[in-house]
């Protein structure tokens, strides 16, 4: 379906037509543009097994490990060559889950109210709305502190401070220690081990993924996923700025969109493994001259925040990685 047909369904809907017979040589897939096209379901049922769908496959053609949209939608990645899994360069994991944000998150005023010192407060971005630009700096964080936004997590392990102990007792009294996530921990008020990630990526979006360079080197809640670069493999390691320059482009967002989860009203969601398994351009194939040019444009964008530099970066990647439209791409395009 390409529009909301079932009001109670938040995700993309599909109707499966199954027959108890021996006709198992083909699987037919069709798309429905609107509610008016629901008549197709009746037509397929009445004419079964003669009428074919828009796309026909043998069961052996289908890979259960990939998203099925590959079999009925144009894949943006088909327009590009030399693709590799994002996991070649980075690992994506979710942000810190506290199990009780109201208890664990602190504003400066709340810290003062409960006499919690900085030693027991972990600097953290708690809400997506607090990150407005592609680069999040120490000055941005200080501005959030100044505006008394949620900027810390309660970090009490190994503390003997009386104010901390009092706040822990408050959590027990209010039942925080018995919540789903907290009660499963050895120490209920301990935080998940998530070192600050150099790059964050939005979980929900309507206009493509949003990547943020975490220059403040602080932690984040689940409003963002953490992107950690792989450095263990000499041949797979990549310069953080080069990767981030690519992630800022429409080319990157376009290819990533193949692996997202579609919700109602244009909302998309990406789980960590959706991103880990997604395709990216093989940046290791770029020559040193091109890399220098990319990094020069990246620095200019960082300084001036002018999107003209992003457009120029986009053109570089298109010129280096575009390929003649594949047979697969043309096949789907003709059915749109």
Describe the residue ranges of each PLM region.
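Short, surface-exposed, charge-dense and proline/glycine-enriched linear segments
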Residues: 1-4, 26-37, 60-63, 209-221, ...
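Polybasic, glycine- and aromatic-enriched phosphate-binding surface used to engage nucleic acids
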Residues: 74-296, 307-310
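Short flexible/disordered coil segments
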Residues: 26-42, 60-68, 244-252, 261-266, ...
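Signature of N6-adenine DNA methyltransferases within the class I
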Residues: 1-101
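Short secondary-structure transition/capping segments
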Residues: 11-21, 44-55, 228-232, 291, ...
């Amino acid at each position: 379906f390409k529009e909301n047909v079932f009001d109670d369904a938040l995700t993309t809907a599909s109707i499966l037509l199954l027959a108890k017979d021996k006709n198992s040589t083909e699987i037919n897939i069709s798309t429905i543009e609107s509610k008016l096209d629901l008549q197709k379901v009746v037509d397929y049922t009445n004419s079964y097994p003669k009428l074919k769908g828009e796309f026909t496959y043998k069961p052996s053609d289908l890979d259960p490990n990939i998203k099925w949209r590959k079999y009925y939608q144009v894949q943006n990645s088909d327009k590009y060559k030399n693709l590799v899994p994002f996991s070649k360069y980075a690992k994506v994991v979710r942000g810190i889950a506290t199990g009780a944000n109201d208890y664990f998150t602190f504003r400066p005023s709340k810290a003062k109210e409960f006499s919690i010192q900085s030693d027991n407060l972990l600097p953290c971005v708690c809400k997506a709305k607090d990150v407005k630009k592609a680069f999040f700096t120490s000055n941005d964080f200080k501005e959030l502190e100044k505006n008394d936004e949620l900027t810390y997590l309660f970090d009490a392990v190994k503390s003997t401070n009386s104010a901390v102990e009092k706040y822990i007792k408050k959590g027990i009294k209010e039942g925080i220690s018995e919540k789903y996530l907290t009660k499963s921990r050895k120490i209920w008020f301990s935080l998940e081990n998530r070192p600050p990630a150099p790059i964050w990526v939005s979980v929900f979006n309507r206009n493509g993924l949003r990547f943020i360079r975490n220059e403040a080197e602080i932690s984040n809640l689940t409003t963002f996923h953490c992107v950690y670069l792989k450095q263990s493999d000499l041949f797979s390691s990549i310069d953080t700025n080069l990767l981030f320059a690519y992630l800022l482009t429409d080319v990157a967002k376009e290819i990533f969109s193949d692996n997202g989860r579609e919700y109602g009203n244009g909302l998309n969601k990406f789980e960590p493994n959706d991103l880990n398994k997604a395709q990216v351009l093989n940046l290791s194939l770029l020559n040193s001259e091109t890399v220098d040019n990319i990094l020069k444009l990246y620095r200019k964008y960082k300084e001036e925040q002018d999107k003209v530099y992003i457009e120029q970066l986009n053109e570089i990647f298109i010129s280096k990685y575009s390929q003649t439209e594949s047979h697969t791409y043309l096949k789907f395009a003709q059915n749109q």
